[in-house]
């Protein structure tokens, strides 16, 4: 069952957090290649899970998550200023690696397709040689 108010609130929080990360946070630990993938607000509106994707190496990911965790109080205040709700939800950042996994799977599939194409070409060449 979908809750329209929770969905609207999630979308609004996503905009606020994206804007805050892009324009207001000055923490050098936070990578410029950080994006908000998804925002889930609990039904009781007390907590918000913010799924973040960071393109970069493991150190950049860890540094970005540390910076975002330290800035969660600031981001919570920004959310509180801009939404009308009885409670301002507690912000919880979580690393989402689905984009990296998708890129990895795409590369694996591409490699397998190339290998299959090459093996088909080799088998066609041997058949052509045997016909002569």
Curated annotation (Swiss-Prot):
Gene3D superfamilies: 3.30.300.20. GO terms for molecular function: ribosomal small subunit binding. Its main location: cytoplasm. One of its GO terms (biological process) is maturation of SSU-rRNA. It is found in: Cytoplasm. SUPFAM superfamilies: Ribosome-binding factor A, RbfA. One of its GO terms (cellular component) is cytosol. One of several proteins that assist in the late maturation steps of the functional core of the 30S ribosomal subunit. Associates with free 30S ribosomal subunits (but not with 30S subunits that are part of 70S ribosomes or polysomes). Required for efficient processing of 16S rRNA. May interact with the 5'-terminal helix region of 16S rRNA. HAMAP family: RbfA (MF_00003). Belongs to the RbfA family. PANTHER family: RIBOSOME-BINDING FACTOR A, CHLOROPLASTIC-RELATED (PTHR33515:SF1). Monomer. Binds 30S ribosomal subunits, but not 50S ribosomal subunits or 70S ribosomes. This is Ribosome-binding factor A. It comes from Alkaliphilus oremlandii (strain OhILAs). The lineage of its organism: Bacteria, Bacillati, Bacillota, Clostridia, Peptostreptococcales.
